[in-house]
Amino acid sequence: MRKLFYFFLIICSITIAQVELKHECSREGSANRWLNAKSTLTENQDKLDISYYGIELDIDFDSEIISGSVIIEGSIGMNQPDSFEFDLLNNMVVDSVKYNGEVSTFTHQDDLINIPAPLAAIPEGYDFSVTIFYHGSPEYCGASGFKFDEHLGIDHVWTLSEAYCARSWWPSKDDPSDKADSVDIIVAVPSNPDFIVASNGILQSMTQSENKKIYHWKEIYPITTYLVSLAIYPYTVWYDQYISSVSNDTMTIENYVFPDRYEGSYSNYLLTKDMIALFSELFGEYPFINEKYGHADFRWGGGMEHQTLTSMGGYSQNLIAHELGHSWWGNMITCKSFHDIWLNEGFARYCQALWVEYQDGEEAYFSFMNNHSYYGGGTVYVENPSSNSIIFNSSLSYNKSSWVLHMLRHIVGDNIFFNILRSYASNDSLAYNVASTSDFQNVCESVSGLDFDDFFDQWIYGDRHPHYQLSWWHEGEGIYKVNIDQLQSTGYFSMPIDITLSGSQGPLVQDTTIVVNNSGSTQIYEFSGLDFLVESVVLDPDGWILKEISYTTAGINNIIANKISVGQAYPNPFNSGIRMDYYIDPKIGDLDMTIEILDINGRRTQTLINNRVTSGFHTVFWNSNNNATGIYFIQLSAADFISTQKIVHLK
């Protein structure tokens, strides 16, 4: 039974020098050579605002060569560039370039296509159009890029361009910070075998000649370069339907599956519409409701959230939920830079937890979070996003990041937490755009009315986690004190903490939970007004904080074997009388018991109880008016159990 009580809270803090929580992540991954020098925009690229890509490719499976063109349209910002620069790896051959319809000179070196800007001044907002004709055999970009592959001996093409590998197969401004407003993707493949080209957005047309099939897909929602994708194979295609309870709109769910995976994936893929419904209820309507959602199998070990058509290397519910979650967190709102990848991956990991909670309940939710906890070093904010291994660190960018949301949820409560997510998803400046950590923090503060500087400094920019040590004792007359130490060496965490005090009142089991604000090395909290004997104190019993916890000696002598609990005698010191609470577990029944007062030499001064005592909660009182001042002992004996406490009598 949970009880509410009034309590008096005293916080005693030891003043210490605060340790700066921000520090550079020391992890060293196997840096992908394509990423070392290409994780930031050039000065000229930063002056361009891209609005459109038109990608047209012809794919030759025999030679493993692609050829075609990309139209790039955009406008000039406040400052005029010296040249127009676009990313394309050096192994690809640029055949020619047109600038505003006219053939232009260019250079292609250091994985950059450089096109001279006009000599005349270009006004702000000036629109430009560049067409780049090129061909080559795409160089596989570490774990990403354009892949000529096979499945069951049949040719298969797939792409995975995150983080910076769109440049391995098509020229672009390859950075997540600048989304094109729309993209056309036109791909020609051989007619035999019966290839299907699956891509982003809506299929506009499929035309077929004797030797070629040409697919035209169009994405009308803003999209960043790494989310543009191709998946090509003689797929088995089947459809499902999502009917929105939010808007009453209907949307097709398209599944492009390897024929040998059809039966294995079918039942889980059927759950997709239920997941869309859940996430739409929690976050707001599915962001690409006017196009589609779907899956395309590919030969890679995980999944990739390509906009409107996730590439799938498996079909577990966890994977489906994770990649679908990216539709809101990663696709509609994309991290502004890969420093902030947690806004994509941590949110998607948390979507897995929300699906587990929906399917299997609260206990399963907490179990999922515990199974995805991380207690090592490093910051959630990626200090140096130079390689995939650093950016996509599963412990930091996925697991610890999901705990940030888990903790935030408990701090503000469910109503405000999901209002934060809905407000974030519908923010006019962020929806279908890009966001940084500070953008998300601003939304959190605006919706909740709270200051989250400490929270984000600790959990996003700071290292590690709190290690709490708790001890407690009974002061007497219903007063208990709880001491919380922070033992970690990386700085002190400022967090609200649930403290649950449990015990008994006669045969009744009682507990109450209070919230304390903790922020220092050592803090002591005093609680009064409890009308039950406290037998245990637990910090964060439900597991809302990513932490380590240790307990030191408690103030109740819990004898597990005999189930006898003895409270501290109170008040102590005393001047006229003292009392002591004790409890006998009903499971062991009545006991022969003696409670005596002994003087400092161990001689019996008075016998308070010497008879058979029933199980349950009891209080014994000693009136000391006829006794001299000094040190005494109150001793309880039952069978082999003896509890002795020192008491001080003053007059």
Predicted features by range, described:
Residues S394-V482:
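Amphipathic alpha-helical substructures
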Residues E345-I411, D428-A431:
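Acidic/His/Gly-enriched intrinsically disordered linker/tail segments
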Residues G68, S161-E162, K173-A321, Y350:
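Hydrophobic helix-coil surface modules that form long, contiguous segments used
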Residues Q18-S67, D453-D454, Q458:
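N-terminal, polar/Ser/Thr-rich
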Residues T308-F366:
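Zinc-dependent metallopeptidase catalytic helix centered on the HExxH motif
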Residues E20-L21, S83-F84, L89-H151, E526-D531, ...:
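A surface-exposed beta-strand-loop module
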Residues Q45, F133-V183, G543-I556, I560:
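Glycine/proline-rich low-complexity spacer/linker segments in large multi-domain proteins
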